[in-house]
Amino acid sequence: MKFKEVRNTIKKMNITDIKICGINEYFMSMKLLDVEVVIMRSNGFVNITRLCNLEGKDFNDWKQLESSRRLLNTLKDNNKLHDPIINIRHTRIKINGEYVSQLLLDYVIPWISPYVATRVSILMRYYRRCVALNIETEKDIDHSQELQNQISKIDEVYDRSIKDISNRFKEIETSYYSKLSTYLLTKAERVLEKDYSMEQDIDNNEDIRTDEMIAAIEAEIEENNRRYLSIISGIRKQHAEDRINISKIMLSGDSFNEIIVKIRDYIETTAKPAVANNYE
């Protein structure tokens, strides 16, 4: 996957664009828009293979550069206890790959692309300031996946509500069209059977009643559609308001744990679609 189309569009980023998720007790991930980094919890090493794949590059090509060889030799000489590169083989594809120290990462990401380098730099700065230096953040990371799941439930609730209402209004509409078809068929049969050479006041009255019923049913179909669109519009508006309110909570400046509690409470008590019960 490459980012040629994305580079042509500059999107304003804010802190809410950064998503932190715990993969397991050994790995976590951080994502900014369309760039994601997988990080080892124990030492902060980053999966460089996945980042190279974003631009269709191979980390081995970087390692073959003369300047890269000199850099790697220097890093190994200065830090004999730790290799700046770790190869991880795991059953989960997301975890597989070569991991590099944060020091080495700063040298590699500009080679990948300016686009990736910019976003990774933002993510790693956020990691160093808000994750690695915050002893509570490890718990926050574990809870963040639960939080993301809960927030996604909002979409599920609203989607399910819209689907249920759509099905119900479809049933009502089908009933109306069934009645309309009956009257239209009756009218067509009377037109075919009518003897236009004779005065037929009774038949004319019957035709008028049929036309009135057809007009009434068509009006009910139109009203049914109007009410459906009104209810769906209201639900979508409320959904958007819930998202805005959750964003405000996330930007409140509270601790991450407090934000989690507030969002969970909001989801449980407030984020519910107000659906009209009398749309029969």
Swiss-Prot record:
InterPro entries: KilA/APSES_HTH, KilA_N. It comes from the Viruses. Residues 26-127 form the KilA-N domain. Keywords: Early protein. This is Uncharacterized protein FPV236.
